[in-house]
Amino acid sequence: MSDDDCDIFSAARKRIPEIALPKNPYNLGNDSFSKEVDYDFIEDLPKKSTKTGKRKNPAATRKNPPKSQDDASPPKQAEHKAVEPEEDMRTERSLSPVSLLILEMEKKNGQQSDVEKHAKENDVGPVARRTRSSLNRSEMAPPPVSPTVEVPTQTKPKKRGQKKRTSLTTTTSNSASMEVSLPSIVGQNNEHISRRWTLAEVAARSKVVDSIDLVSAVAPRVEGFVNLDSEDEGEKEAPPVVEEENIFDNDNPTIEVALSWLGEIQIYKLRQHQKFKHLFKELASRNGIDENDITVDMYYNFVGPEDTPHSIGLKSFHTLTGHPTKSHNNNNVAAKIDYNPEALCRKPKKFQVKVQADKWKHPLVIPMKKTDNFKIIFIKCAEELNCDPRTIKLFFDGDLLDPNDTPNNQDMEGNEVIDLKIKA
Protein backbone atom coordinates (compact mmCIF):
# COMPACT_ATOMS: atom_id res chain seq x y z
CA MET A 1 0.00 0.00 0.00
CA SER A 2 1.50 3.20 -1.13
CA ASP A 3 1.28 6.61 0.36
CA ASP A 4 -0.75 7.81 -2.59
CA ASP A 5 -3.51 5.42 -1.72
CA CYS A 6 -3.66 6.67 1.78
CA ASP A 7 -3.52 10.34 0.89
CA ILE A 8 -6.41 11.93 2.64
CA PHE A 9 -6.25 15.14 0.62
CA SER A 10 -6.75 13.45 -2.77
CA ALA A 11 -10.29 12.10 -2.03
CA ALA A 12 -13.43 13.91 -1.12
CA ARG A 13 -14.25 13.75 2.47
CA LYS A 14 -17.95 13.49 3.46
CA ARG A 15 -19.04 15.36 6.49
CA ILE A 16 -22.06 14.24 8.46
CA PRO A 17 -24.39 17.20 9.12
CA GLU A 18 -25.43 18.02 12.57
CA ILE A 19 -29.08 17.32 13.33
CA ALA A 20 -30.67 20.36 14.89
CA LEU A 21 -34.27 21.56 15.31
CA PRO A 22 -35.31 24.18 12.75
CA LYS A 23 -35.80 27.63 14.22
CA ASN A 24 -38.07 28.84 11.39
CA PRO A 25 -41.25 27.07 10.24
CA TYR A 26 -41.20 24.98 7.15
CA ASN A 27 -41.37 27.05 3.96
CA LEU A 28 -41.24 25.84 0.41
CA GLY A 29 -39.28 28.91 -0.62
CA ASN A 30 -36.49 28.11 1.86
CA ASP A 31 -33.84 25.80 0.21
CA SER A 32 -31.95 25.04 3.41
CA PHE A 33 -34.10 21.98 4.14
CA SER A 34 -33.80 20.61 0.67
CA LYS A 35 -30.07 20.29 0.91
CA GLU A 36 -29.42 17.80 3.72
CA VAL A 37 -25.89 17.00 2.55
CA ASP A 38 -23.31 19.68 2.26
CA TYR A 39 -20.14 19.23 0.28
CA ASP A 40 -17.35 21.63 0.70
CA PHE A 41 -15.70 21.59 -2.67
CA ILE A 42 -18.14 19.72 -4.96
CA GLU A 43 -20.91 21.81 -6.43
CA ASP A 44 -23.51 19.79 -8.26
CA LEU A 45 -25.80 21.80 -10.53
CA PRO A 46 -29.49 20.88 -10.09
CA LYS A 47 -31.01 19.16 -13.09
CA LYS A 48 -34.05 20.73 -14.66
CA SER A 49 -37.08 18.48 -14.70
CA THR A 50 -38.73 17.88 -18.02
CA LYS A 51 -42.22 17.77 -16.41
CA THR A 52 -44.12 21.03 -16.47
CA GLY A 53 -45.98 21.73 -13.24
CA LYS A 54 -48.20 24.50 -12.01
CA ARG A 55 -46.36 27.62 -11.06
CA LYS A 56 -47.05 28.63 -7.53
CA ASN A 57 -47.65 32.25 -6.72
CA PRO A 58 -45.14 33.73 -4.32
CA ALA A 59 -46.43 34.33 -0.85
CA ALA A 60 -47.67 37.82 -0.19
CA THR A 61 -45.28 39.82 1.91
CA ARG A 62 -46.70 40.89 5.20
CA LYS A 63 -46.48 44.54 5.89
CA ASN A 64 -45.32 45.84 9.18
CA PRO A 65 -48.07 47.19 11.46
CA PRO A 66 -48.26 50.98 11.79
CA LYS A 67 -46.31 52.44 14.63
CA SER A 68 -48.78 55.26 15.36
CA GLN A 69 -51.49 54.74 17.97
CA ASP A 70 -54.21 56.41 15.85
CA ASP A 71 -54.25 53.66 13.29
CA ALA A 72 -54.80 50.74 15.66
CA SER A 73 -56.78 48.59 13.19
CA PRO A 74 -55.01 45.56 11.67
CA PRO A 75 -53.72 45.81 8.10
CA LYS A 76 -56.37 43.47 6.66
CA GLN A 77 -59.21 45.78 7.79
CA ALA A 78 -57.44 48.76 6.32
CA GLU A 79 -57.12 47.05 2.99
CA HIS A 80 -60.80 46.10 3.04
CA LYS A 81 -61.84 49.67 3.72
CA ALA A 82 -59.71 50.99 0.90
CA VAL A 83 -61.24 48.57 -1.60
CA GLU A 84 -64.93 49.12 -0.63
CA PRO A 85 -65.52 52.44 -2.45
CA GLU A 86 -64.18 50.94 -5.69
CA GLU A 87 -66.76 48.16 -5.48
CA ASP A 88 -69.56 50.71 -4.83
CA MET A 89 -68.54 52.66 -7.89
CA ARG A 90 -68.58 49.57 -10.09
CA THR A 91 -71.84 47.96 -8.92
CA GLU A 92 -75.04 49.98 -8.43
CA ARG A 93 -77.29 48.87 -5.65
CA SER A 94 -81.08 48.73 -6.35
CA LEU A 95 -83.29 51.03 -4.29
CA SER A 96 -86.22 49.92 -2.17
CA PRO A 97 -89.82 50.99 -3.04
CA VAL A 98 -89.91 53.49 -0.16
CA SER A 99 -86.68 55.13 -1.23
CA LEU A 100 -87.96 55.29 -4.85
CA LEU A 101 -91.12 57.09 -3.72
CA ILE A 102 -89.06 59.55 -1.67
CA LEU A 103 -86.83 60.17 -4.68
CA GLU A 104 -89.88 60.79 -6.91
CA MET A 105 -91.36 63.25 -4.40
CA GLU A 106 -88.11 65.17 -4.22
CA LYS A 107 -87.96 65.36 -8.04
CA LYS A 108 -91.58 66.58 -8.24
CA ASN A 109 -91.00 69.26 -5.60
CA GLY A 110 -87.92 70.43 -7.45
CA GLN A 111 -89.79 70.62 -10.76
CA GLN A 112 -92.73 72.48 -9.20
CA SER A 113 -90.40 75.06 -7.70
CA ASP A 114 -88.77 75.49 -11.13
CA VAL A 115 -92.19 75.93 -12.79
CA GLU A 116 -93.30 78.53 -10.23
CA LYS A 117 -90.06 80.42 -10.64
CA HIS A 118 -90.43 80.34 -14.42
CA ALA A 119 -94.09 81.52 -14.20
CA LYS A 120 -93.12 84.46 -11.99
CA GLU A 121 -90.40 85.51 -14.39
CA ASN A 122 -92.68 85.11 -17.47
CA ASP A 123 -95.83 86.62 -15.99
CA VAL A 124 -97.76 88.01 -18.98
CA GLY A 125 -100.77 90.17 -18.04
CA PRO A 126 -104.11 90.28 -19.88
CA VAL A 127 -104.46 92.16 -23.15
CA ALA A 128 -106.57 94.98 -21.67
CA ARG A 129 -103.89 95.89 -19.06
CA ARG A 130 -100.86 95.82 -21.32
CA THR A 131 -98.82 98.99 -21.76
CA ARG A 132 -95.98 100.09 -24.00
CA SER A 133 -93.47 99.17 -21.33
CA SER A 134 -94.44 95.52 -21.68
CA LEU A 135 -93.69 95.37 -25.42
CA ASN A 136 -89.94 94.83 -24.96
CA ARG A 137 -90.37 92.12 -22.42
CA SER A 138 -88.96 88.92 -23.81
CA GLU A 139 -90.56 85.68 -22.91
CA MET A 140 -88.33 83.04 -21.48
CA ALA A 141 -88.18 79.63 -23.02
CA PRO A 142 -89.57 76.72 -21.01
CA PRO A 143 -87.06 74.85 -18.92
CA PRO A 144 -85.37 71.95 -20.70
CA VAL A 145 -86.91 68.58 -20.07
CA SER A 146 -84.47 66.12 -18.68
CA PRO A 147 -84.82 62.77 -20.44
CA THR A 148 -85.65 59.94 -18.12
CA VAL A 149 -84.52 56.45 -18.91
CA GLU A 150 -86.31 53.48 -17.50
CA VAL A 151 -83.76 51.21 -15.85
CA PRO A 152 -85.06 47.65 -15.49
CA THR A 153 -84.03 45.86 -12.36
CA GLN A 154 -82.45 42.44 -12.53
CA THR A 155 -84.71 39.77 -11.14
CA LYS A 156 -83.24 36.82 -9.35
CA PRO A 157 -84.10 33.27 -10.42
CA LYS A 158 -87.20 31.88 -8.81
CA LYS A 159 -86.87 29.38 -6.04
CA ARG A 160 -89.37 26.91 -4.85
CA GLY A 161 -91.03 27.52 -1.50
CA GLN A 162 -90.67 31.32 -1.65
CA LYS A 163 -93.40 33.91 -2.09
CA LYS A 164 -93.50 36.18 -5.11
CA ARG A 165 -91.97 39.58 -4.66
CA THR A 166 -93.28 42.63 -6.44
CA SER A 167 -90.86 43.92 -9.04
CA LEU A 168 -89.80 47.54 -9.04
CA THR A 169 -90.18 48.00 -12.79
CA THR A 170 -93.82 49.11 -12.44
CA THR A 171 -92.98 51.80 -9.91
CA THR A 172 -90.10 53.10 -11.99
CA SER A 173 -92.24 53.23 -15.17
CA ASN A 174 -95.04 55.12 -13.38
CA SER A 175 -92.59 57.63 -11.96
CA ALA A 176 -90.97 58.13 -15.37
CA SER A 177 -94.36 58.75 -17.05
CA MET A 178 -95.33 61.28 -14.37
CA GLU A 179 -92.03 63.09 -14.77
CA VAL A 180 -92.52 63.32 -18.55
CA SER A 181 -96.19 64.43 -18.42
CA LEU A 182 -95.65 67.36 -16.03
CA PRO A 183 -93.16 69.25 -18.24
CA SER A 184 -95.34 68.61 -21.30
CA ILE A 185 -98.32 70.26 -19.58
CA VAL A 186 -96.17 73.24 -18.63
CA GLY A 187 -94.95 73.52 -22.21
CA GLN A 188 -98.55 73.53 -23.56
CA ASN A 189 -99.54 76.33 -21.17
CA ASN A 190 -96.53 78.37 -22.25
CA GLU A 191 -97.42 77.85 -25.94
CA HIS A 192 -101.00 79.00 -25.26
CA ILE A 193 -99.72 82.13 -23.48
CA SER A 194 -97.30 82.90 -26.27
CA ARG A 195 -100.08 82.53 -28.89
CA ARG A 196 -102.30 84.94 -26.99
CA TRP A 197 -99.40 87.34 -26.67
CA THR A 198 -98.75 87.33 -30.43
CA LEU A 199 -102.46 87.86 -31.23
CA ALA A 200 -102.60 90.76 -28.80
CA GLU A 201 -99.53 92.28 -30.41
CA VAL A 202 -101.07 92.00 -33.88
CA ALA A 203 -104.33 93.58 -32.67
CA ALA A 204 -102.50 96.41 -30.89
CA ARG A 205 -100.35 97.29 -33.91
CA SER A 206 -103.12 97.03 -36.54
CA LYS A 207 -104.88 100.10 -37.94
CA VAL A 208 -108.32 101.19 -36.65
CA VAL A 209 -110.82 100.74 -39.49
CA ASP A 210 -114.09 101.77 -37.87
CA SER A 211 -115.76 102.14 -34.47
CA ILE A 212 -119.21 101.10 -33.24
CA ASP A 213 -121.28 103.06 -30.73
CA LEU A 214 -123.03 100.37 -28.72
CA VAL A 215 -125.13 102.90 -26.77
CA SER A 216 -126.88 104.75 -29.59
CA ALA A 217 -126.75 101.98 -32.19
CA VAL A 218 -130.00 100.31 -33.32
CA ALA A 219 -130.23 96.61 -32.61
CA PRO A 220 -130.13 94.63 -35.87
CA ARG A 221 -133.00 92.40 -36.82
CA VAL A 222 -132.19 88.76 -36.27
CA GLU A 223 -133.77 86.22 -38.60
CA GLY A 224 -135.53 83.27 -37.08
CA PHE A 225 -137.20 85.11 -34.19
CA VAL A 226 -140.81 86.31 -33.85
CA ASN A 227 -141.43 90.01 -33.15
CA LEU A 228 -144.32 90.18 -30.68
CA ASP A 229 -145.00 93.88 -31.42
CA SER A 230 -145.48 93.45 -35.15
CA GLU A 231 -148.95 93.00 -36.62
CA ASP A 232 -147.73 91.42 -39.83
CA GLU A 233 -147.29 88.02 -38.28
CA GLY A 234 -150.18 85.74 -39.02
CA GLU A 235 -152.05 83.96 -36.33
CA LYS A 236 -150.76 80.57 -35.47
CA GLU A 237 -152.86 77.67 -36.56
CA ALA A 238 -154.79 76.06 -33.76
CA PRO A 239 -153.49 72.64 -32.79
CA PRO A 240 -155.60 69.76 -34.03
CA VAL A 241 -158.29 68.70 -31.63
CA VAL A 242 -157.57 65.32 -30.18
CA GLU A 243 -160.66 63.20 -30.17
CA GLU A 244 -161.82 62.17 -26.78
CA GLU A 245 -161.54 58.47 -26.13
CA ASN A 246 -164.88 56.76 -26.45
CA ILE A 247 -165.43 54.92 -23.19
CA PHE A 248 -168.59 53.26 -24.52
CA ASP A 249 -166.92 51.17 -27.23
CA ASN A 250 -165.97 48.38 -24.85
CA ASP A 251 -169.54 48.03 -23.58
CA ASN A 252 -171.15 48.23 -27.03
CA PRO A 253 -168.91 46.28 -29.46
CA THR A 254 -169.90 45.36 -33.02
CA ILE A 255 -170.57 41.68 -33.71
CA GLU A 256 -171.30 39.65 -36.84
CA VAL A 257 -174.75 38.03 -37.02
CA ALA A 258 -175.13 34.93 -39.21
CA LEU A 259 -178.65 34.46 -40.65
CA SER A 260 -179.87 31.55 -42.79
CA TRP A 261 -182.30 32.82 -45.43
CA LEU A 262 -183.83 30.01 -47.50
CA GLY A 263 -180.70 27.88 -47.09
CA GLU A 264 -178.31 30.80 -47.80
CA ILE A 265 -176.07 32.07 -45.00
CA GLN A 266 -176.02 35.87 -44.88
CA ILE A 267 -173.81 37.97 -42.58
CA TYR A 268 -174.99 41.19 -40.94
CA LYS A 269 -173.30 43.50 -38.43
CA LEU A 270 -175.01 44.77 -35.31
CA ARG A 271 -173.91 46.34 -32.06
CA GLN A 272 -174.67 44.66 -28.78
CA HIS A 273 -177.41 47.13 -27.80
CA GLN A 274 -178.62 47.93 -31.33
CA LYS A 275 -182.19 46.88 -32.09
CA PHE A 276 -183.05 44.19 -34.66
CA LYS A 277 -185.27 46.57 -36.61
CA HIS A 278 -182.09 47.75 -38.38
CA LEU A 279 -181.43 44.12 -39.39
CA PHE A 280 -185.03 43.76 -40.66
CA LYS A 281 -184.55 46.80 -42.91
CA GLU A 282 -181.31 45.48 -44.38
CA LEU A 283 -182.80 41.99 -44.82
CA ALA A 284 -185.86 43.39 -46.64
CA SER A 285 -183.81 45.59 -48.97
CA ARG A 286 -181.37 42.77 -49.73
CA ASN A 287 -184.01 40.13 -50.56
CA GLY A 288 -186.69 42.44 -52.04
CA ILE A 289 -189.37 41.71 -49.44
CA ASP A 290 -191.52 43.98 -47.30
CA GLU A 291 -190.16 44.60 -43.82
CA ASN A 292 -193.45 43.51 -42.19
CA ASP A 293 -193.38 40.12 -43.96
CA ILE A 294 -190.18 38.84 -42.32
CA THR A 295 -189.96 36.44 -39.40
CA VAL A 296 -186.68 35.75 -37.57
CA ASP A 297 -186.14 33.16 -34.84
CA MET A 298 -183.23 31.78 -32.87
CA TYR A 299 -183.65 28.06 -32.23
CA TYR A 300 -187.47 28.34 -32.49
CA ASN A 301 -187.60 31.49 -30.35
CA PHE A 302 -188.97 34.45 -32.24
CA VAL A 303 -186.94 37.62 -32.39
CA GLY A 304 -188.79 40.95 -32.53
CA PRO A 305 -187.68 44.26 -34.01
CA GLU A 306 -187.28 45.81 -30.52
CA ASP A 307 -184.96 43.08 -29.28
CA THR A 308 -181.19 43.44 -29.18
CA PRO A 309 -178.36 40.91 -29.35
CA HIS A 310 -177.65 41.65 -25.71
CA SER A 311 -181.26 41.05 -24.63
CA ILE A 312 -181.56 37.64 -26.34
CA GLY A 313 -178.00 36.54 -25.43
CA LEU A 314 -176.76 36.27 -29.01
CA LYS A 315 -173.16 35.12 -29.48
CA SER A 316 -170.89 34.96 -32.49
CA PHE A 317 -171.33 31.19 -32.88
CA HIS A 318 -175.15 31.38 -32.99
CA THR A 319 -177.06 31.28 -36.29
CA LEU A 320 -180.46 32.89 -36.82
CA THR A 321 -183.12 31.66 -39.23
CA GLY A 322 -185.24 33.95 -41.42
CA HIS A 323 -188.57 33.16 -43.22
CA PRO A 324 -190.74 35.21 -45.59
CA THR A 325 -194.34 35.29 -44.24
CA LYS A 326 -197.55 37.29 -44.95
CA SER A 327 -199.14 37.11 -41.54
CA HIS A 328 -198.39 40.80 -40.86
CA ASN A 329 -197.75 39.97 -37.21
CA ASN A 330 -195.27 42.81 -36.88
CA ASN A 331 -198.08 45.36 -37.37
CA ASN A 332 -199.51 44.47 -33.94
CA VAL A 333 -197.17 46.82 -32.20
CA ALA A 334 -199.55 47.75 -29.39
CA ALA A 335 -199.01 44.41 -27.68
CA LYS A 336 -195.23 44.98 -27.53
CA ILE A 337 -195.17 48.62 -26.51
CA ASP A 338 -193.83 48.99 -23.01
CA TYR A 339 -194.80 52.58 -22.50
CA ASN A 340 -198.56 52.20 -22.56
CA PRO A 341 -200.35 53.54 -19.45
CA GLU A 342 -200.97 50.12 -17.97
CA ALA A 343 -197.35 49.02 -18.35
CA LEU A 344 -196.07 52.24 -16.82
CA CYS A 345 -198.32 51.96 -13.76
CA ARG A 346 -197.71 48.26 -13.26
CA LYS A 347 -195.06 47.37 -10.66
CA PRO A 348 -192.12 45.83 -12.54
CA LYS A 349 -190.82 42.40 -11.72
CA LYS A 350 -187.24 43.53 -12.34
CA PHE A 351 -185.37 46.76 -11.68
CA GLN A 352 -185.92 49.38 -14.36
CA VAL A 353 -185.60 53.15 -14.85
CA LYS A 354 -187.44 55.65 -17.01
CA VAL A 355 -185.76 58.24 -19.17
CA GLN A 356 -187.71 61.29 -20.31
CA ALA A 357 -186.59 63.80 -22.92
CA ASP A 358 -187.90 66.31 -25.41
CA LYS A 359 -187.16 63.92 -28.26
CA TRP A 360 -189.99 61.51 -27.48
CA LYS A 361 -193.50 61.81 -26.04
CA HIS A 362 -193.42 58.85 -23.71
CA PRO A 363 -190.58 57.98 -21.32
CA LEU A 364 -188.13 55.27 -22.35
CA VAL A 365 -188.19 52.26 -20.02
CA ILE A 366 -184.78 50.60 -19.61
CA PRO A 367 -184.50 47.39 -17.53
CA MET A 368 -181.16 46.85 -15.79
CA LYS A 369 -179.57 45.65 -12.57
CA LYS A 370 -178.76 47.78 -9.56
CA THR A 371 -175.09 46.86 -9.89
CA ASP A 372 -174.86 47.79 -13.60
CA ASN A 373 -173.21 51.04 -14.64
CA PHE A 374 -175.18 53.92 -16.10
CA LYS A 375 -173.24 53.33 -19.33
CA ILE A 376 -176.09 51.04 -20.42
CA ILE A 377 -178.57 53.93 -20.18
CA PHE A 378 -176.25 56.18 -22.20
CA ILE A 379 -175.80 53.51 -24.89
CA LYS A 380 -179.51 52.63 -25.19
CA CYS A 381 -180.53 56.25 -25.37
CA ALA A 382 -177.92 56.85 -28.09
CA GLU A 383 -179.24 53.85 -30.06
CA GLU A 384 -182.77 55.16 -29.70
CA LEU A 385 -181.81 58.65 -30.84
CA ASN A 386 -179.21 57.35 -33.36
CA CYS A 387 -176.45 59.64 -32.01
CA ASP A 388 -173.11 59.47 -30.24
CA PRO A 389 -173.43 58.51 -26.55
CA ARG A 390 -170.77 61.11 -25.66
CA THR A 391 -173.24 63.89 -26.55
CA ILE A 392 -175.76 62.78 -23.92
CA LYS A 393 -176.11 64.08 -20.36
CA LEU A 394 -178.25 62.41 -17.71
CA PHE A 395 -179.52 64.13 -14.55
CA PHE A 396 -181.15 62.60 -11.47
CA ASP A 397 -182.68 65.03 -8.94
CA GLY A 398 -180.65 67.81 -10.58
CA ASP A 399 -177.31 65.99 -10.21
CA LEU A 400 -175.24 64.95 -13.22
CA LEU A 401 -174.82 61.18 -13.44
CA ASP A 402 -171.43 59.66 -14.05
CA PRO A 403 -171.36 56.84 -16.63
CA ASN A 404 -169.31 54.71 -14.22
CA ASP A 405 -171.78 55.20 -11.36
CA THR A 406 -174.44 52.60 -10.39
CA PRO A 407 -178.07 52.83 -9.23
CA ASN A 408 -177.10 51.19 -5.98
CA ASN A 409 -174.85 54.16 -5.12
CA GLN A 410 -177.73 56.58 -5.85
CA ASP A 411 -180.15 54.65 -3.56
CA MET A 412 -182.55 53.91 -6.41
CA GLU A 413 -185.38 51.45 -5.81
CA GLY A 414 -186.90 51.27 -9.31
CA ASN A 415 -189.06 53.29 -11.73
CA GLU A 416 -187.03 56.44 -11.02
CA VAL A 417 -187.23 59.12 -13.70
CA ILE A 418 -183.98 60.40 -15.24
CA ASP A 419 -183.78 63.55 -17.33
CA LEU A 420 -181.90 63.46 -20.65
CA LYS A 421 -180.22 66.42 -22.31
CA ILE A 422 -178.06 66.62 -25.41
CA LYS A 423 -174.93 68.77 -25.55
CA ALA A 424 -175.19 71.80 -27.80
From Swiss-Prot:
Q: What does this protein do?
A: Required for repair of DNA double strand breaks which occur during replication or are induced by ionizing radiation (IR). Functions with dgrn and downstream of the SMC5-SMC6 complex to regulate strand break repair. Likely functions by stabilizing the association of heterochromatic double strand breaks (DSBs) with the nuclear periphery as part of the homologous recombination (HR) repair process.
Q: What is this protein called?
A: DNA repair protein Rad60
Matching entries from InterPro entries are given as:
NFATC2-Int_DNA_Repair (IPR052324), Rad60/SUMO-like_dom (IPR022617), Ubiquitin-like_domsf (IPR029071)
Region spans: Disordered: 45-177
Bias type Low complexity, positions = 167-177
PANTHER family per UniProt? NFATC2-INTERACTING PROTEIN (PTHR47187:SF1)
Task: Name the phenotypic consequences of knocking out this gene.
Answer: Larval neuroblasts exhibit significant genome instability, including increased aneuploidy, chromosome fusions and satellite repeats.
Positions of post-translational Phosphoserine modification: 32, 34, 96
Q: Organism, per UniProt?
A: Drosophila melanogaster (Fruit fly)
GO CC terms: nuclear periphery; nucleoplasm
Q: Which UniProt keywords apply?
A: Nucleus, Phosphoprotein
Q: Which domain of life is it from?
A: Eukaryota
Q: Ranges of Basic residues compositional bias? A: 48-57, 156-166
Point to the regions of Basic and acidic residues compositional bias: 77-93, 104-123
Give residues where Phosphotyrosine occurs: 26
- Please verify whether the record's keywords include Transcription: no
Please list the GO biological process terms of this entry: double-strand break repair via homologous recombination
